[in-house]
Structures are given as structure tokens and as C-alpha cells.
């Protein structure tokens, strides 16, 4: 199908009305809108990672409550809704208040209030933000004769940067708590209140008085309220898949598999349909390229800092983690573990749930996130991630994929001898993690500290019909590493794998901070 016959992908467009009127591709989520606004609670909160469709959902609610029935022609809600009542809508976008101090935050909130005060009026004596919010809600109700809808998108945006700062967090949190406080007192005047964010509302303690919010984030009926399911993609995006397949010179089936490996895998409850990252998927269709769009759209500096703070190794990220339901609601500002941040930020997702133990299993959702995380962690093991480093890793991949482990190790030896070495290089674990990161970047199966009946293998990697059993030594010899493999009979652990087992003993030169020598036995 020719490109001009397809609807445009709405890259960066988060306004429902603009998408519909501009004839952009829209994945119909209006059934969830109907379910939510006719549900048991008039106060709802949704947590999802960044760029996952929260703002578009909020905008959809805005159009619905504004009574813009024409925009919903042909969508699920058109058949479900029998009454299209127009309500006054107060829509606040807190993403405008990132990286701010107290004065700037108050100024931004005042600016957003003033826009609606021009419509409904402002009492002269009202100076405080909460008084102005209260007055605004009551005036809108009085002037229209209808209850008011309040939509707050990315409510936690002003606080994310200062989450663990003892000085700034309480100050900004008090401003936000004050701004949101009228939502409970004004309950008789409110038809619906909807808030979105990344962190759970209970974690920031700014809704301590508003205890009637329904958190729909992990409820099964709303599992696919944001993101794109496999069914939605294959029913509504077949032409885009076929065009991408032609561009990538792959079959449709191969393209579907690549899309699944790279962008799928999210679950926000269990059981749940597989959910694709909408930002990455739409960008892939718009550009006809399978690139890392979501990870590249935001540098996870804060995440990397927290991983270091909690001493989380790359290999621990590569394996699954387990968590109780309460762990998802642990106070973020007093975080004692990395699980809440990894999950809410979209770097980990739910992969399984044991109902008896009430235990969730979490893991990296897909290939894009795995590669992105490892690339972000690499500078911590190579001092800096240079262009030469990227080239070397690519050449190593080609060598190993071609069965030339010796050539790959020579490339790594040469590269490590030319870069500034990091701290903490005088222990085997540093190089073990370095190998883990590099092999993970290849998209290959890799694990460290693999248990066997007689010990633990430093590194195990599987590629191209071969399974590499790798032992690392520091300041000794490659022969000593190989002797250790043979003494512990590591290959026997993998004898039933059906793969050719290759033993690799590697010694690192302590003074030169690179590979000293190695022995390979097939």
C-alpha cells in the first residue's frame, strides 16, 4: 500500500481533537473512557510510564466531557453513550512545571488558573492558590448549572526531579498539596476528577486528605487503557506492518516477530494482554525503521544514579526480580529498593504472578529497554562510551556470531588497552559485569554466576548453536582459569543442552587493565 493512502502516525501529538480532525491514526480507547466515567468512583488515578499515552487519554476525556460528540463518530463510545452532556472542564498540564523552584511552580500554577478565571471570574480577595481553585470550581458550577470536571495530567511532574532532596521536596510538595486540597472540599460541585502520573499518589503524600481516589493503575479492566495490544496492532495497523516489512526486506511474519521482540512485553497487572510501547511502535511505523525510540527520548540519568545508590549490578537487572503488591506503593521519597522506580518508569514490567504467595515477578519488558539500559550502564565500566567502543562492540558481535571467539577477545583486548580505566577494576566482578553488558548488547543469552553441582560459572553465553562457559581470573593465568573449569566439571552441567559447549579461560592483566591471555577449547 502506498504511503499517502495511510493515515499519518501522530508522533508527538497528544490532543484527541487534533488527531481526529487531522485524520491521524487513532487506536480506539474510548471503551475504557466510558467504563471509567460510568464506574463506581468519580475520582480516578492512573499511573503509567512516560510517553505511554496518558496525555492523549486525558485529552480524550476532555473532549468527551466537553460534549464534542462529533469527534467520537465511529468509535466504541458512540454506541455505548446515550447522553452527551457538556460539563465545564478544568484541564491542568503539570508537565509544564518540570525543573522548577517554589516561585516558578507557584507562578506556573497561577498562570494555569488565570486562563480559566478569565472565563469564570476571580474574586478580588483570593490570593492563595487553593482559594482560587475553590472559587474557580464553585463559579464554574454556578455559571453553567453543571458539576465541574477536573483533569490533572502528570500531577507529579514538578516533584520528580527533587524526589530524594531533603530541602526542595518538602517545599514543592507543600505547594502541590495546597493546590490540590480543594478537590475534597469541593466534592458536591465535581462530576469527575482524573489524575495521571508516573509515581503512585500515595507515595508522594500530597493527597493525604483525598482518600477517595480509585487507583485504576493495576486493575484488570484497565490493563490496556494505554499502550497498544497485539490485537489492536494486527487489526488496525496491518498496512503499516506490511509497509515496514517491505522497507526492512523481511516477510510480514518476520516483521511481527521483530516488533514483538523490540517493543512488546508490557503488563500492568496479571493476567494482562501483551502491550506494546505506543511511542516506539508508532515511530517505527512512521519512519519504517526498527530503532530504539522510547529509550532514546529520555536520558535515564536519575535511574542510573539510583542503581548505583542501591548497588544494583547489570546482571541483576538482566534477571527477574520479585515483589509483593505493597512494594509497588512503597514511599518513593523514602525508597529502600529499586523495584518501584524500575516498574513505574517502564524499565521493568510484570511478567508473572503467584496468587498463593501474592508475589509478582518483574523483568525487562523487551529488547529496546534491555539494550538501552545496558548502553547506559556501559560508561560505568569503560570510563566513557566512545564511538570506538561502539564500533568495537559491533565488530565483536560479528566475530562471535561467526564463531570466532578468539577474534572477539583480541578486539576487546585492544580496545580496553586504549581507554581510560575506571575505578574498582582490581576485582573479577568488574570484568564479569563488563562481559555481561557487552554480551547483552549483542542480544545474546548471557548469565553470570550460574550454579552447577560443583560451583558457579562466571559467565555463560549462548549464540549460534554454541554455549560458551567462561571463567575469569585476575592477575593469574588463562591456564589457571581453564584448569578451574575442568576441575569443577562445568561443561557437564550443560551436556544435555544440545549445544556445542566451548570452554573459555580468560586472565586479566592487573597493571594494563585489559585482557592478558586466554585459552579456548572446543
Give each language-model segment a name.
Residues 435, 459-474, 488:
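Conserved catalytic cores of phosphodiester-cleaving nucleases, focusing on short active-site segments
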Residues 149, 466-468, 502:
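Structural motif
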Residues 493, 499-522:
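Domain-level recognition of nuclease-like catalytic cores that cleave nucleotide substrates
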Residues 170-174, 474-491:
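Mg2+/Mn2+-dependent nuclease catalytic core
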Residues 139-144, 438-465:
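Active-site metal-binding core of divalent-cation-utilizing nuclease and nuclease-like domains
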Residues 1-427, 442:
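Phosphate-binding site recognition
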Residues 179-186, 340-348, 436-440, 484-504:
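Metal-dependent nuclease catalytic cores in nucleic-acid-processing enzymes
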Amino acid at each position: 500500500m502506498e504511503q499517502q493512502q495511510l493515515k499519518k502516525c501522530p508522533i508527538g501529538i497528544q490532543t484527541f481533537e487534533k488527531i481526529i480532525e487531522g485524520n491521524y491514526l487513532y487506536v480506539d480507547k474510548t471503551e475504557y473512557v466510558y467504563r471509567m466515567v460510568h464506574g463506581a468512583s468519580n475520582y480516578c488515578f492512573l499511573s503509567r510510564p512516560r510517553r505511554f499515552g496518558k496525555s492523549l487519554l486525558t485529552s480524550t476525556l476532555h473532549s468527551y466531557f466537553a460534549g464534542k460528540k462529533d469527534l467520537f463518530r465511529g468509535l466504541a463510545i458512540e454506541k455505548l453513550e446515550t447522553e452527551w452532556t457538556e460539563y465545564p472542564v478544568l484541564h491542568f498540564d503539570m508537565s509544564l512545571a518540570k525543573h522548577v523552584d517554589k516561585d516558578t511552580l507557584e507562578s506556573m500554577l497561577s498562570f494555569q488558573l488565570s486562563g480559566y478565571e478569565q472565563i469564570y471570574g476571580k474574586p478580588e480577595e483570593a490570593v492563595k492558590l487553593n482559594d482560587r481553585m475553590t472559587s474557580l470550581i464553585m463559579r464554574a458550577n454556578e455559571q453553567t448549572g453543571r458539576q465541574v470536571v477536573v483533569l490533572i495530567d502528570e500531577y507529579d511532574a514538578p516533584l520528580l526531579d527533587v524526589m530524594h532532596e531533603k530541602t526542595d521536596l518538602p517545599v514543592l510538595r507543600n505547594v502541590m498539596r495546597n493546590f490540590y486540597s480543594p478537590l475534597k472540599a469541593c466534592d458536591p460541585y465535581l462530576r469527575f476528577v482524573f489524575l495521571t502520573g508516573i509515581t503512585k499518589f500515595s507515595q508522594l503524600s500530597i493527597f493525604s486528605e483525598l482518600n477517595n481516589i480509585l487507583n485504576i493503575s493495576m486493575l484488570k479492566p484497565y490493563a490496556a487503557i494505554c499502550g497498544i495490544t497485539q490485537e489492536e496492532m494486527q487489526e488496525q495497523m496491518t498496512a503499516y506492518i506490511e509497509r515496514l516489512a517491505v522497507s526492512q526486506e523481511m516477510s510480514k511474519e518476520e516483521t511481527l516477530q521483530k516488533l514483538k521482540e523490540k517493543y512488546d512485553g508490557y503488563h500492568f497487572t496479571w493476567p494482562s494482554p501483551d502491550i506494546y510501547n505506543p511511542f516506539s511502535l508508532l515511530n517505527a511505523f512512521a519512519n519504517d525503521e526498527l530503532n530504539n525510540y522510547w529509550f532514546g527520548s529520555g536520558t535515564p540519568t536519575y535511574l542510573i544514579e539510583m542503581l548505583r545508590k542501591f548497588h544494583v549490578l547489570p546482571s541483576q537487572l538482566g534477571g527477574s526480580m520479585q515483589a509483593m503488591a505493597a512494594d509497588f506503593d512503597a514511599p518513593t521519597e523514602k525508597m529502600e529498593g529499586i523495584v518501584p522506580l524500575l516498574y513505574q518508569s517502564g524499565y521493568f514490567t510484570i511478567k508473572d504472578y503467584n496468587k498463593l504467595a501474592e508475589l509478582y515477578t518483574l523483568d525487562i519488558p523487551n529488547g529496546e529497554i534491555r539494550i538501552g539500559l545496558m548502553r547506559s550502564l556501559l560508561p560505568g565500566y569503560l570510563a566513557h562510551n566512545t564511538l570506538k567502543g561502539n564500533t568495537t562492540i559491533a565488530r565483536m558481535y560479528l566475530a562471535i556470531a561467526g564463531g570466532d571467539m578468539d577474534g572477539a577477545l583480541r578486539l576487546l583486548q585492544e580496545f580496553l588497552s586504549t581507554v581510560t580505566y575506571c575505578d574498582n577494576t582490581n576485582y573479577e566482578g568488574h570484568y564479569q559485569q563488563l562481559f555481561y553488558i557487552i554480551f547483552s548488547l549483542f542480544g545474546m543469552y548471557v548469565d553470570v554466576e550460574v550454579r552447577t553441582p560443583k560451583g558457579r560459572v562466571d559467565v555463560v553465553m549462548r549464540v549460534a548453536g554454541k554455549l560458551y562457559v567462561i571463567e575469569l581470573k585476575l592477575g593469574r593465568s588463562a591456564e589457571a582459569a581453564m584448569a578451574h573449569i575442568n576441575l569443577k566439571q562445568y561443561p557437564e552441567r550443560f551436556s544435555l543442552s544440545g549445544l556445542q559447549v566451548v570452554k573459555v579461560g580468560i586472565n586479566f592483566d592487573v597493571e594494563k587493565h585489559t585482557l592478558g591471555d586466554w585459552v579456548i577449547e572446543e
